[in-house]
Design a protein with these regions (language model features):
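Membrane-anchoring alpha-helices and their flanking helix-loop junctions
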Residues: 1-146, 155-218
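Conserved SAM-binding loop
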Residues: 149-151
Length: 218
């Protein structure tokens, strides 16, 4: 709970300190949806004590490339929020999208969170890091969204990640967030290779579910 409260406080600080204003309505939309998603996540995992422990304190075996991913992607995501706040709240570099475009971006943002949460609930091995969870008896998840693509959690992350700058009202923030999205796609490919090599029955699962990220596309 302390960690969750701290995360919410940091998110609020990034959004509203960077914009320099509290009447930043796009910031409030982003903040409220993000907090609602965090609260729903806590409720969905209310009986998944093993998964909660794994996500808070992952076991041994995190891959070196995953450490590199976090070192690069975290500042990019934070930077995107800061750039968006400065852009929309102070400098006004970006023109405001129309109501229809903004509504569409918000819908995709919410959809991304929904897909991410669905995957998190369906997969009891939804760790926060890339590792083989031999200590937890990891098996292949074939339930829920995993019937349609092999990495639905990353699909959800891509959707709400790429929509974050637009929900915050900034086109310029797409630059750092776009780089973060490229890194996430690379992480997905590396993790899929790791699972194919080291997780029992994953190669057979790949034959049954052909799509890596986008169902029916790739």
């Amino acid at each position: 709970r302390v960690r969750s409260a701290l995360g919410i406080a940091i998110l609020a600080g990034l959004v509203f300190l960077s914009s320099g204003r509290l009447d930043y309505w796009q910031g409030w939309v982003f903040f409220c949806v993000s907090v609602a998603a965090a609260m729903l996540s806590a409720w969905l995992l209310r009986d998944r004590f093993g998964l909660i422990a794994e996500r808070l304190h992952p076991g041994k075996g995190m891959k070196w490339w995953d450490k590199g991913y976090f070192m690069l992607s975290t500042p990019l995501y934070i930077g995107a929020i800061i750039v968006a706040g400065i852009d929309t709240g102070r400098r006004h570099w970006s023109s405001s999208p129309g109501a229809m475009i903004y509504g569409l971006c918000l819908a995709v943002f919410v959809l991304g969170h929904a897909v991410f949460l669905w995957a998190k609930r369906a997969n009891p091995f939804f760790s926060s890091v890339a590792r083989i969870q031999s200590d937890r008896g990891q098996t292949v998840c074939r339930e829920g969204p995993y019937k349609f693509c092999r990495h639905p959690g990353y699909l959800g992350g891509l959707l709400f990640g790429l929509m974050t700058p637009l929900v915050l009202g900034s086109y310029w923030a797409l630059i750092p967030q776009g780089l973060a999205a490229v890194l996430l796609i690379g992480r997905t490919c590396l993790e899929d290779r790791m699972l194919t090599k080291d997780l029992l029955w994953y190669a057979e699962y790949k034959q049954a579910v052909r799509s890596l990220l986008f169902p029916g596309v790739w």
